[in-house]
Amino acid sequence: MRDVSLNPVRPLVTDLTNLTELAWLDDRAIAPALVTLTSGATRVVVAPEVGGALAAYYESTPEGALHWLRPATQAAFDERDPLRMASFPLFPYCNRIRDARFEFGGGTVDLSGNDLRFAHALHGNAWRHPWQVGACTESSVELHFEHTPDPQQPGDWPFRYRAQQRIELVGGALHVALSAQNLGDRPMPFGMGHHPYYPRTAQTRVYANVQRMWHADADVLPTHLGPHPAVEALRHGMSPDAFALDNNFANWSREATIAWPDEHRQLTMTADTPFDHLVVFAPANDAQLCVEPVTNTTDCFNAVDMQEQVGGCVLEPGEEIAATLTWTPRKG
C-alpha cells in the first residue's frame, strides 16, 4: 500500500495532458504518479513509483524549461526505468559488486540472478522498487522504502533495512537528505548515494578537486588507485569529451560544479560526509554525463582490507545513518 499524505494543492498526478510545467514531455504523455515541487520559478518532479527517482529539476522561463538535470523521457516513464530518469537513489550500496557476490559475516552473500542484464550486481535494490510518499508540502516531499528479504527471490538483498529521502527546494537549490536504518538483528554492510545525469553539450565543463582516480578493468571494476590526467583536468574544468570515464575518484572536496559557459550558467553540488567518493561517468561518443556523490567506491564489499580507501560501512542492528546532498544553480 502506498501511504499518501499530500497537501491538497500539490496532488499526485497521473495525467500529464494539462501540465504545461512538464512541457518537455509529449503533450499526450501518461506517466506514473508524480509529485511536483515548486519554489518560485523552480520545479522538481519526483517519480516515487519509478525507484524513488527525480524525473526533472528545472527553472520555468518564458522561453521554456531550463533543465539543471537531464529530464526523463517518455520512454523512461513507459518502461518505469530509473536509469533514464534525471537522478535516482542508491541503497544499500553504490555501483557494481564483482560477480554479484562477496563475503560477509562468515558466509557468502550471493546477489546473482536478480537482473540478468548485468554480470555484476548494480546500485543496490532500492531503485528497482516503488517508494511510498510521506509528508508533502508545496516545496518538499518525503519518500520511504522498506526492504524485507525474500528467500524465494534469487539474488535478493539478505538484510532488512529502511531508507528515506527528503527532497526539498529552498529557493532554487535542491536538497536531498538521504537516510537509512538497519532493521535486522545482525550487522549489515552498507553504502548510499544518488545518480544524477546532467545535460551534456560540447561546451560543458566539470570542476572538482580530486586527488587520485581508481583505474578500472573492462568490467568497470577498480584495479588500483593512482594518478590520471583527468585528476588535473577536473581541477581546471574538464570537458566530458576529454576522456572516456566511468571511474571513482578519491579525496574530493565534496564539492563539484557542472558548468555550461556558453549558456552562462552552472550547477554546484555539495555533499556531507560520508559522501567521500565521487564517480564521473562520461563515456565517449555518448550524450550521458553523471557526476555522482557516493559513500563507497565500486566493489567496496570485496575490498575489506582497504576500508579507509573504499568507504562504505557496517550498520549495527538499529543503527541509522543520514547525510544531505545539495545542488545550487547559478546564472550569469
PLM regions: where:
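Active-site/ligand-binding surface loops and adjacent short beta/alpha elements
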Residues: 9-12, 16, 187-189, 196-273
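Hydrophobic residues embedded in beta-strands of well-ordered beta-sheets
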Residues: 35, 44, 141, 174-176, ...
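Acidic/His-leaning functional-site neighborhoods
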Residues: 42, 120-134, 205-206, 234-311
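Intrinsically disordered, low-complexity Pro/Gly/Ser/Thr-rich segments with frequent PxxP/GP/PP motifs
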Residues: 310-321
